[in-house]
């Protein structure tokens, strides 16, 4: 589904793959089961995904907020300007969150086992509710194993803070 000037809204559906792209408008996806790739993008607008269950989530925003709540296998998010808020009910594959200007927040289940690599040029990194092992910590960088390690979780923002915390549902 493509839109040049206007919002895209999709809800209560099952699909193999789904792509929603808006040049100037919001993308709002709710209560979707996607067996393949769910791809949501906006050049100038917010991207909001709630109650999602997908094998692979890809999302991008040039200028706007980006949020995701649900289950996903592989997660890839890219933003230029705006905050990112990802709330995963469980960790099923690698996560890559990249931003230029804006805070990035990842909430994940308490039992998730992953290798964390978080980096920011001008911002803080906060890890709450998890213990990190065999790691590297310096201003702007936090690396290490959470719950013994596992999937790769890479978070990078140039100008913004990074928060990794337990999902309140876990």
Regions from the PLM with identified roles:
Residues 1-170:
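Intrinsically disordered, low-complexity terminal regions
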């Amino acid at each position: 589904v493509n839109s040049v000037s206007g919002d895209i809204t999709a809800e209560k559906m099952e699909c193999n793959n789904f792509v929603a792209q808006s040049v100037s408008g919001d993308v709002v996806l709710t209560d979707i089961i996607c067996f393949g790739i769910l791809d949501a993008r906006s050049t100038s607008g917010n991207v909001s995904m709630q109650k999602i269950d997908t094998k692979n989530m890809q999302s991008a925003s040039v200028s706007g907020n980006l949020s995701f709540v649900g289950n996903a296998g592989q997660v890839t998010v890219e933003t230029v300007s705006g905050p990112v808020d990802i709330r995963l009910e469980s960790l099923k594959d690698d996560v890559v969150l990249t931003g230029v200007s804006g805070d990035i927040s990842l909430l994940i289940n308490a039992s998730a086992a992953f290798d964390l690599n978080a980096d920011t040029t001008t911002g803080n990194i906060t890890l709450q509710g998890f213990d990190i092992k065999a790691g590297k910590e310096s201003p702007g960088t936090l690396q290490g194993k959470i719950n013994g390690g596992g999937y790769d979780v890479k978070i990078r923002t140039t100008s913004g803070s990074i928060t990794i915390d337990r999902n309140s549902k876990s």
